[in-house]
Amino acid sequence: MAGARLFRFRDEPGPGADPTVLEVRVPQVLHVQYGMYVWPCAVVLAQYLWFHRRVLPGKAVLEIGAGVSLPGILAAKCGAKVTLSDSPELPHCLDICWQSCQMNNLPQVQIVGLTWGHISKDTLSLPPQDIILGSDVFFEPEDFESILATVYFLMQKNPKVQFWSTYQVRSADWSLEGLLYKWDMRCVHIPLESFDADKEDIAESTLPGRHTIEMLIISFAKDSS
C-alpha cells in the first residue's frame, strides 16, 4: 500500500456555527506514470465538486483517467454513485484507484478499464451517467479527440450528461474549439473564484500552487436545457 496524502475540504459557515469538513485520503506514489500522484488540476476539480456537493447524492458519476481519483473519491463521499476508470494498459493506475477506495472505505465504488476512443465491453456496459469527471486529461494533444469521442459515446446514453473537466494551461496554441464543433459539443468556462478555487492552497494541500488552471463544463450542443 502506498503512503497516504490527506486533503481537508472545508466550508466556512456564518459566525457561531461549526465548519463542515470532509477529509479525503489518496495514495501518493512517485512513479513515472502520470496517474500515480495528485496533479494541481485534481484538487481544483475536487473543490468544484465540494462546492456543489448538494447536487451529488444519487448521481451517476464516471471519472476518466482517474489515477489516484481525488475528484471521484470526493464525489462518492458526497453520495454519488461513482465509477472510476483508467487505461487497462496501465494496471498500476487501476490498482491505485482501488487503493484510494480502500483508504476511504468505499467498497461500493466500481473500477473499470477504459481506453479513450475505443468502445470496449466495459464501455458498452456502463450505465447512463449524469456527470463525467476528468482532471488534466487534456494533457497530450493527440489524445484530445479520443477523449471527446468517448464522451460523445456516453452522451448518446444520456444527452444531458455533463463533462466536468479541469485543464492546466501549458500552451496558448492548444485549443478544443474545432474538436468541440466536430463532435457537436459546447463548452462553458467556469471562473475559479465562483467556487473558491482562486487560490494557491486548496484543501490544505499547497495545490494548485501558481499553475494556471481552467474549469470547463462540456455538454451536448443539442441539449438546449
UniProtKB/Swiss-Prot annotation:
Keyword Transcription regulation assigned: no
Protein location: Nucleus; Cytoplasm
InterPro entries on file: Methyltransf_16, SAM-dependent_MTases_sf
GO biological process terms on file: cognition; epigenetic programing of male pronucleus; epigenetic programming in the zygotic pronuclei; epigenetic regulation of gene expression; methylation; positive regulation of transcription by RNA polymerase II
EC number annotated for this UniProt entry: 2.1.1.319
Pfam family, one: Methyltransf_16
Family recorded in the similarity comment: Belongs to the methyltransferase superfamily. METTL23 family.
Protein known as: Histone-arginine methyltransferase METTL23
